Amino acid sequence: MFTVISYFGFLLVALAFTLVTYLGLRAIQLI
């Protein structure tokens, strides 16, 4: 059970990091 929670936690962090990077690149292009 702990492994599943850890896996989903890692997936969520990876998704958030990708989203932040994507938004950051978009912001740089708009400037």
UniProtKB/Swiss-Prot annotation:
Electron transport keyword on record: yes
GO molecular function: electron transporter, transferring electrons within cytochrome b6/f complex of photosystem II activity
Signal peptide: none
One Pfam match: PetL
Sorted UniProt keywords: Chloroplast, Electron transport, Membrane, Photosynthesis, Plastid, Thylakoid, Transmembrane, Transmembrane helix, Transport
GO cellular component labels: chloroplast thylakoid membrane; cytochrome b6f complex
Protein name (database record): Cytochrome b6-f complex subunit 6
Organism lineage: Eukaryota, Viridiplantae, Chlorophyta, Nephroselmidophyceae, Nephroselmidales
